[in-house]
Regions:
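Short coil/turn connectors at secondary-structure junctions
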Residues: 1-2, 24-27, 54, 74-77, ...
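Ordered, amphipathic secondary-structure segments that act as subunit-interaction surfaces
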Residues: 59-104
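Glycine-rich, aromatic-bearing surface loops/beta-hairpins
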Residues: 94-156
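Short, hinge-like loop/turn segments at secondary-structure boundaries
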Residues: 47-49, 75, 119
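Short gly/pro/ser/thr-enriched loop/turn and capping motifs at secondary-structure boundaries
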Residues: 37-39, 64-65, 108-111
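Long, hydrophobic N-terminal alpha-helical segment
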Residues: 1-55
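General beta-strand structural signal in soluble alpha/beta enzymes
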Residues: 5, 31, 57-60, 80, ...
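Short amphipathic alpha-helical segments and helix-helix/interface helices
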Residues: 46, 88-92, 129-130
């Protein structure tokens, strides 16, 4: 069962590794990111960052969708971490029933507009987010579970 879908350009780091799994009793993390899945060094580094007692997959969006829709992880409490809005939109197209997406960190870059404390969106990322919103998905900006969620839907 998917407990959290999160966009975070850093993929696995302190907030993702410690705060969210504890708050949501996560026992399986899927990093669905083509770059990480295709780079052995990045995959190894991310594997070292995973919390004890939590299993980890570093796979593509397509592989994540297949794994999640196959029923193989129905008994698990899963957190899916994606690196960007494009992969998130592709993921949502393949995995039905996603109702909330956590925007945890999208890096500042040239031409990006700030929407939240750690959320900077380019025109394409805004378009991707609007497409997610149009699917009826609640887009919450929140870095850690202890913070209040700020709704991105209202700002798009």
């Amino acid at each position: 069962m998917i407990k959290l879908v999160r966009i975070d350009y850093r993929l696995l780091h302190g907030q993702v590794v410690f705060a969210w799994p504890r708050a949501l009793d996560i026992d399986h993390i899927i990093v669905a990111n083509a770059n990480a899945a295709g780079d052995a060094f990045v995959s190894m580094s991310l594997s070292l960052a995973k919390p004890a007692g939590v299993s980890l997959d570093i796979i593509t969006v397509e592989q994540a969708a297949e794994k999640l829709t196959s029923g193989k992880l129905d008994h698990k409490k899963v957190m899916v971490v994606l690196g960007n809005t494009a992969e998130t939109l592709a993921f949502v197209e393949k995995v039905p029933g996603i109702s909330v997406i956590n925007y945890g960190g999208i890096a500042q870059k040239e031409g990006a507009q700030q929407f939240g404390k750690a959320i900077y969106l380019t025109e394409q990322e805004i378009a991707d987010s609007q497409a997610l919103k149009a699917k009826g998905i609640r887009l919450e900006m929140r870095q850690v579970p202890a913070h209040s969620a700020e709704l991105l839907n209202d700002k798009l």
